Curated annotation (Swiss-Prot):
This is Aspartate 1-decarboxylase. One of its GO terms (cellular component) is cytosol. Is synthesized initially as an inactive proenzyme, which is activated by self-cleavage at a specific serine bond to produce a beta-subunit with a hydroxyl group at its C-terminus and an alpha-subunit with a pyruvoyl group at its N-terminus. It catalyses: L-aspartate + H(+) = beta-alanine + CO2. Binds 1 pyruvoyl group covalently per subunit. InterPro entries: Asp_de-COase-like_dom_sf, Asp_decarbox. Its EC number is 4.1.1.11. It is found in: Cytoplasm. It comes from Francisella tularensis subsp. novicida (strain U112). The active site is at S25, Y58. Substrate binds at T57, G73, P74, A75. Catalyzes the pyruvoyl-dependent decarboxylation of aspartate to produce beta-alanine. One of its GO terms (biological process) is pantothenate biosynthetic process.
């Protein structure tokens, strides 16, 4: 049996763009992805702090150091530019494994 645990969390990501007619996904600055240990095409949960919307999608790598956080496709209807997001990924692990440390990136404080 495996359990789902928090793997990575990007806190206070600011939406910088949205493209309703793109096929889907969230575009994230590749440097932020690296800091958070999130890879391209990884499934993530997106939580909008401004309106409470939650959705799941996959990640597209954005330009490094661009600070890009853009929701694409139907997900673009769940946010506005300037909204604050939590972007969360999970891992499936053996429940007997101890000391699982998620990678936390806080864009508000820079940690």
């Amino acid at each position: 049996m495996l359990i789902s645990v928090l793997k990575s969390k990007i806190s206070y990501a600011t939406v910088t763009g949205k493209d309703l007619f793109y096929v889907g996904s969230i575009t994230i600055d590749s440097e932020i992805m690296k800091q958070a240990n999130i890879i391209e095409n990884e499934k993530v949960q997106v939580v909008n702090l401004n309106n409470g919307a939650r959705l799941e999608t996959y990640v597209i790598k954005g330009e490094p150091n661009s600070k890009t956080i853009a929701l694409n496709g139907p997900a673009a209807r769940r946010c506005e530019i300037g909204d604050q997001l939590f972007i969360i990924s999970y891992a499936q692990v053996d429940p007997t494994r101890e000391n699982i440390k998620p990678k936390l990136v806080d864009l508000k404080t820079g940690d």
